[in-house]
Regions:
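Extended, solvent-exposed, non-transmembrane regions
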Residues: 1-284
Length: 284
């Protein structure tokens, strides 16, 4: 049997998704989504001036995924000769964007632009791919009930520490915990912890670390009446929670959900905006 190592590309993006429970069960058919085959290539999708039920309106929703070997000529030689492609490098890019978004809830949520994504490099000796936050990741023009919000991101953290091993090594130093621990909830009181960790410890399950790319979430002026901000979450009284910039980090993949809305008004719903996942690895 002739079997040579090959790179298996992997990237997914969805602009809008979720489920609205009432008055009629609505599983959202995402208006824009992209996914790569294991051979790589490119996948793009875009929708404009869309409406989902009576809840969501958007000016545009788009996704992009691309996986390519960095040297076309050398990759072509592996197909026509005896050399193996595991000596080559590959890059996978993925992004998702929503523009002019309106979510009609108890407090109307609006955003001029939400964009998130990753750039991944194929694994080398460590076996871990480098996966860094795309430089165009941004929240722009965000407001709740007309009250403007400022969402400041800590992009540098998720660009510099682009592998899980780098992140774990850095986490053993007090300086890292002091500077970046908040973005990884290292000292937070969370379900499953009896008390907050004094030294700092990841919120982790099954080898996947939970964090946020949000450095600061604050009101530009007066706050929405009764709303509370805790880290990257806004809680709306008698309505629900809005999560900004959630990131999931494991040894071989990273996933970013730019916006998650768990609401019960005007009806129960979970919505996600600009969701991306990136990784890739060798077949053996």
């Amino acid at each position: 049997m002739k079997l040579k190592p090959r790179f298996l590309f992997h990237a997914n993006a969805a602009a809008i998704g979720g489920r609205i429970a009432k008055p009629k069960d609505l599983a959202i058919d995402t208006p824009a989504a992209s996914s790569l085959t294991a051979a790589g290539g490119r996948s793009t999708s875009k929708a404009e001036n869309g409406r989902i039920g009576e809840v969501i309106q958007f000016g545009s929703a788009s996704t992009f995924a691309e996986g390519l070997f960095d040297n076309l000529g050398k990759w072509a030689e592996t197909l026509c000769g005896d050399s193996c492609e595991d000596a080559l490098t590959a890059t996978t890019r993925v992004s998702s964007e929503v523009r002019n978004l309106t979510v009609n809830a108890k407090a109307t949520f609006t955003a001029r632009r939400i964009n998130g994504g990753f750039v991944a490099k194929s694994p080398k000796g460590s076996g871990e791919p480098s996966i860094s936050l795309d430089r165009d990741t941004v929240f722009d023009g965000v407001a709740l009930g007309g009250y403007k919000l400022i969402v400041e991101l800590n992009a540098a953290l998720f660009q510099r520490f682009d592998t899980l091993s780098k992140l774990r090594t850095a986490a053993d130093t007090p300086k890292f915990v002091k500077e970046h621990g908040a973005g990884l909830f290292m000292k937070a009181s969370v379900p499953g912890r009896t008390t907050a960790s004094a030294a700092g410890r990841f919120v982790e399950s099954g080898g996947t670390i939970y964090g946020t790319i949000v450095k600061s979430l604050r009101w530009a002026g007066k706050p929405y009446p009764g709303a509370e901000i805790d880290d990257n979450v806004i809680t709306i009284p008698d309505c629900g929670d809005i999560y900004f910039g959630e990131i999931y980090i494991s040894a071989y993949r990273r996933r970013l959900t730019m916006l998650r809305m768990d609401l019960c008004c005007p009806q129960p719903m979970r919505l996600m905006m600009a969701d991306t996942e990136d990784n890739g690895g060798w077949s053996g």
